[in-house]
């Protein structure tokens, strides 16, 4: 993670889109929680629109995302609404209970900070109690904004203490670290001060600018690899061209660093590495115990954070086309995304 987004890695259903994108069309009720799917996942938003047009699916939102291209009802914008839903004292509670295939989509804006834990765990418990987390239909869905987030959680690349979800960020803020290794991490905010920073990545973005050492890596188009999508499915990515200059594939850089540090690896080549990754994900996928937690209430506004649509990653920020799109967009006071007043 590069931000304080709450994650519960205990079981895989906690951080993927369980209902599936295709399953949206079968839903009879959709509740958005701190999410703007039009900007965060345009294809997913198109499916929601299709569900509305085809099935007249009712759509509700906690937080106001603006124009989503289909009608919806804002039922509130704070964690009190979540509390009322869980207690069964909000009118939407009964509508969810009476629906056959409801979908709850929790966005990163709702998961930010300590309140994110309350929102997620409370909604999960409500759905589990009402039998909406089962093998044939799981209404719990997390909409991530980072393409690598699901895969990173699958591999255990996170820092979580027993009773603390953000120990890494706390240490980062108080200056506990003297050495930081940024693996393609360009959106993490901290003061460099006297920290020694190594950056490994494909584009000379924010991370490279503050680094003491840069290890040039291959872009996703310049290497074979695996991606885990929103639904938790593993997808293969194939090399379209070779990396320029001294740039190398990420796994080769890490393997050489391991040798220098005299650390042993359980793989010899990329095929063995990918085999181990798939095995690890399969084990985690079969470990869904459907655990629920009771979390102390935290009152907080659920405001949907704006997205710099054309500048969401380092590759987009280095694109001349994306820069031009961003420049043109800034000229318009009304973009079509906002609601007309």
Regions found by a protein language model. Give the residues of each.
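Long, low-complexity segments enriched in small/aliphatic residues
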Residues: 274-341
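Non-catalytic alpha/beta scaffold blocks inside enzyme catalytic domains
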Residues: 2-290, 333-341
């Amino acid at each position: 993670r590069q931000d304080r987004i709450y994650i519960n890695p205990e079981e895989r259903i906690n951080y993927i889109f369980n209902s599936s994108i295709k399953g949206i069309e079968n839903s009879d009720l959709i509740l958005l929680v701190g999410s703007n799917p039009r900007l965060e996942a345009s294809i997913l938003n198109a499916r929601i629109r299709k569900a509305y047009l085809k099935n007249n699916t009712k759509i509700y939102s906690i937080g106001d995302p603006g124009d989503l291209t289909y009608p919806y009802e804002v039922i509130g914008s704070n964690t009190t609404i979540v509390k009322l839903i869980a207690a069964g004292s909000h009118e939407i509670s009964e509508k969810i209970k009476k629906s056959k295939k409801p979908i709850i989509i929790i966005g990163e804006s709702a998961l930010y900070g300590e309140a994110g834990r309350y929102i997620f765990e409370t909604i999960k418990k409500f759905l589990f109690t009402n039998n909406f987390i089962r093998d044939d239909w799981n209404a719990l869905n997390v909409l991530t904004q980072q393409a690598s987030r699901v895969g990173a959680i699958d591999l255990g690349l996170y820092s979580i203490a027993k009773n603390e979800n953000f120990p890494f960020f706390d240490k980062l803020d108080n200056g506990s670290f003297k050495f930081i290794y940024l693996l393609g991490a360009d959106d993490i905010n901290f003061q460099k001060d006297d920290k020694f920073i190594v950056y490994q990545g494909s584009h000379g973005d924010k991370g490279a600018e503050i680094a003491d050492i840069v290890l040039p890596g291959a872009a996703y188009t310049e290497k074979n690899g695996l991606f885990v999508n929103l639904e938790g499915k593993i997808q293969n990515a194939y090399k379209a061209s070779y990396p320029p200059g001294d740039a190398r594939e990420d796994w080769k850089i890490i393997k050489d660093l391991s040798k220098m540090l005299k650390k042993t690896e359980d793989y010899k080549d990329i095929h063995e590495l990918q085999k181990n990754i798939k095995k690890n994900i399969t084990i985690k996928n079969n470990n869904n115990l459907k655990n629920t937690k009771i979390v102390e209430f935290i009152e907080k506004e659920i405001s949907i954070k704006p997205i710099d649509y054309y500048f969401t990653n380092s590759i987009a920020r280095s694109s001349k086309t994306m820069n031009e799109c961003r420049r043109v967009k800034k000229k318009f006071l009304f973009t079509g995304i906002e609601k007309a007043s």
